[in-house]
């Protein structure tokens, strides 16, 4: 417990990336309903193009993100976190373009392209967590991250976008405009993401370098690990 939660780099990393998933899960959930409302198309057509674009973009994005993360790690102890910045600065403008374009097929294309960025980061938090704890603690650290990511990202992202859409609709917006505005507004959480990533970047080199010393101070037998 102390190895995980007394590491500032660990805590900031565990909070930063779920804020990205807050957006990506929410956008993934509401993209199809939004396009159906905006462009008056069938669920079959939207589902086919959105599904294929998300699957292919996600496959390429997560693979490229992992490769980039390992490359960046070789250059700087906190290098993997750069993938988080890339995800934010790639996802935000592309999602805005997707929800505000007047062309349905441009929206389909942008759905694919934004997944190259929005799906690039999932391998970064667990690999970063593994660098900050002893080998026997990696599963626990990963489990804590999955719990936080599930609660903040998977549970809250789609829900909060829907609630915000209902709030806008209650002011007189139609269902399409209210949902579009809700998606756009929730991108503001990326401000918190950037702050948390920067704090994690600041503390990660020291926390990783002091991993064995921190474990020894907590009474762990680190001789075998050090060997």
Predicted regions, residues:
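A membrane-interface helix-boundary motif in multi-pass transporters
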Residues: 42-45, 79-82, 163-189
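Paired intracellular helix-loop junctions of major facilitator superfamily
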Residues: 73-75, 129-138, 171
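Intrinsic disorder in cytosolic terminal tails and internal cytosolic loops
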Residues: 200-227
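C-terminal ends and interior cores of transmembrane alpha-helices
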Residues: 85-102
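Symmetry-related core transmembrane helices of the 12-TM Major Facilitator Superfamily/SLC fold
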Residues: 86, 92, 180-199
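Cytoplasmic membrane-interface "Motif A"-like loop-to-helix N-cap segments
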Residues: 70-87
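Loop-to-transmembrane helix entry/capping segments in MFS-fold secondary transporters
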Residues: 43-47, 135-145
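Extracytoplasmic gate region of multi-pass secondary transporters
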Residues: 6-65, 110, 114-126, 153-165
């Amino acid at each position: 417990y102390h190895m995980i939660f007394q590491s500032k780099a660990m805590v900031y990393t565990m909070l930063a990336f779920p804020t990205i998933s807050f957006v990506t899960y929410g956008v993934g959930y509401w993209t199809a309903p939004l396009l159906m409302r905006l462009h008056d198309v069938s669920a079959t057509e939207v589902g086919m193009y959105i599904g294929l674009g998300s699957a292919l973009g996600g496959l390429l994005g997560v693979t490229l993100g992992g490769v980039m993360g390992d490359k960046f790690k070789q250059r700087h102890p906190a290098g993997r976190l750069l993938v988080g910045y890339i995800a934010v600065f790639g996802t935000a403008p592309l999602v805005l373009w997707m929800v505000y374009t007047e062309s349905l097929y441009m929206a389909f294309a942008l759905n694919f392209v934004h997944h190259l960025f929005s799906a690039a980061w999932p391998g970064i938090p667990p690999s970063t967590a593994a660098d900050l704890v002893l080998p026997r603690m990696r599963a626990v650290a990963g489990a804590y991250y999955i719990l936080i990511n599930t609660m903040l990202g998977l549970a809250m992202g789609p829900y909060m976008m829907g609630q915000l859409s209902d709030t806008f609709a209650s002011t007189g917006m139609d269902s399409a405009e209210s949902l579009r505005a809700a998606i756009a507004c929730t991108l503001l959480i990326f401000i918190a993401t950037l702050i948390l990533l920067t704090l994690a970047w600041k503390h990660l080199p020291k926390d990783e370098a002091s991993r064995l010393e921190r474990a020894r101070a907590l009474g762990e037998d680190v001789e075998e690990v050090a060997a």
